[in-house]
Amino acid sequence: PSSQPRGDPTGQEEPKKKVEKKTTTDPFD
């Protein structure tokens, strides 16, 4: 997974960023 697999880094980075943004907006709200 550290070799930047096709669809793996994009699928894991999208949900991870969305989760981090939601977590930062949740407590910030």
UniProtKB/Swiss-Prot annotation:
Residues 13-29 have a biased composition (Basic and acidic residues). This is Protein Tat. The keyword rRNA-binding does not apply. The transactivation domain mediates the interaction with CCNT1, GCN5L2, and MDM2. Its main location: host cell. HIV-1 lineages are divided in three main groups, M (for Major), O (for Outlier), and N (for New, or Non-M, Non-O). The vast majority of strains found worldwide belong to the group M. Group O seems to be endemic to and largely confined to Cameroon and neighboring countries in West Central Africa, where these viruses represent a small minority of HIV-1 strains. The group N is represented by a limited number of isolates from Cameroonian persons. The group M is further subdivided in 9 clades or subtypes (A to D, F to H, J and K). Residues 1-29 are annotated as: Disordered.
